[in-house]
Amino acid sequence: MAKITIHTPEEIEAMRRVGSEAADLLDFITPHVKAGVSTLALDELMLDYTVNVLKAKSACLGYNPGDNGIPYPRATCISVNNVICHGIPSEKKILKNGDIVNIDVTIEKDGFFGDNSRMFIIGKPTIAGKRLVEATWGCMWAGIEEVRPGKCFNDIGIACHNFVKPMGLSIVHEYGGHGIGRVFHGEPHVCHVPISTPTAKFEPGMIFTVEPMVNAGKRHIMDLNDGWTVVTKDRSLSAQWELEVVVTETGYDILTVSKGMPEPPTWVKGWKKPNFD
């Protein structure tokens, strides 16, 4: 089993700072996410804000994990409707009423990474789109609520699976959360479905993302030929939310926190959004 970094209190506070700025980036872009705007225009606004306001770098721009040989060409991932993840911003992709949109941002500052994503609904939502977006938000929190010392990473996958299964929704198997800190993608890989192999137990100081990708149809995926974009094989809608989580002595805390982030579901017991007023 690969070693998972245990972060010091000082490192956790550094991660909290960069995490809050990554969340602030999503707050900044929120009023611009509307019908008639291209995903490239949104990406350019966020890159400018990252560099000139946050004084940070985009971790996505030029990112090359080495498995496809194609550096990622934009600063953010913007995935619309049936795009599961890694949607490349484009001037040709114009948002329209009823679209569901995931915006995923990762910034690097002072040697640490902050990574989060948020769903947006353009104009009047469709019944199916609104249901999926809300269900995915709950799915993520169901997984997060399992985090506390003594439990294990597989408990996240079990909780996420059990949350959406009664709704007839499916969770993508091929992608998951990840450790994060001084590296963008570290150990562990966080599965959002149950797995049969043993997983590590949570220990205070572990930091990772929880980011289930939930499809309205079947779980199966298809890669487009641009080397990055992943879509649902049956063309059904897909949604994703992402937060950074740190294990504490008694439970967990959220590191990607901002004034504009949605309130957690009312049934969440382990965390309360801070008062920014």
Residue spans for each PLM region:
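Active-site neighborhoods and metal-handling regions in enzymes and metal-associated proteins
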Residues: M1-D277
